[in-house]
Amino acid sequence: MSNFKVRDPVIQERLDHDYAHHPLVARMNTLDQGNMSQAEYLVQKRHYLVFLIAHHYYEAYLRRMGGIQRRDHLQTLRDQKPRERADRVSAASAYDAGTFTVPSRPGPASGTTPGGQDSLGVSGSSITTLSSGPHSLSPASDILTTLSSTTETAAPAVADARKPPSGKKK
């Protein structure tokens, strides 16, 4: 089991020899020995080196996350959001304007009375229906589409009923 014992790392000595001019080694060598013994000083120097390496990678992380790359990435995301909103608004306005087409399916979407009028008092021919299939909308959407289309055809009649009679005022 003594074979598996972790020995003291020799990173410090390797850095001193291999990378003598590296900025981390220069900062490590500025550590003041003070009144420490040589053994304590080597341990503290090793700990300081670990801190310097961690600090170096943390600064690199901050540069990457807060620097130019991060700002460019965030700006790209911000630029995409208005386009997505504009697409949604244009689709909704196309639907409201009546240019949004929906294929019809056979059979009426709501029951009609014998006089050819549905329960809302609008003729059955003005009701649009949605197609059935694997990609069709839910029955609640069918009802909403039916109601919106009947409202669009009934709206001029309601507006005409609200107009005051055109005549001379006394």
Curated annotation (Swiss-Prot):
Instruction: Give the GO cellular component terms, alphabetically.
Output: host cell nucleus; viral capsid
| Name assigned to this protein | Small capsomere-interacting protein
Name any one Pfam family assigned in the record: Herpes_capsid
As for what it does, the entry says: Participates in the assembly of the infectious particles by decorating the outer surface of the capsid shell and thus forming a layer between the capsid and the tegument. Complexes composed of the major capsid protein and small capsomere-interacting protein/SCP assemble together in the host cytoplasm and are translocated to the nucleus, where they accumulate and participate in capsid assembly.
Q: Name one GO biological process term.
A: viral process
Residue ranges of the region described as Disordered = 76-170
Tree of life domain = Viruses
Similarity remark? Belongs to the herpesviridae small capsomere-interacting protein family.
Compositionally biased intervals (Polar residues): 110-139
Transferase as a keyword of this entry, yes or no, is no
According to the record's subunit comment, the protein's assembly and interactions are:
Interacts with the major capsid protein/MCP.
Record's HAMAP family?
HSV_SCP_gammahv
What organism is recorded for this protein? Answer: Human herpesvirus 8 type P (isolate GK18)
Where composition is biased (Low complexity), the residues are 144-155
Keywords for this protein? Capsid protein, Host nucleus, Virion
Q: What is its main location?
A: virion
Biased composition annotated in UniProt, kind: Basic and acidic residues: 76-88
- Keyword Secreted listed? The answer is no
Gene expressing this chain:
SCP
Q: Where in the cell is it found?
A: Virion; Host nucleus
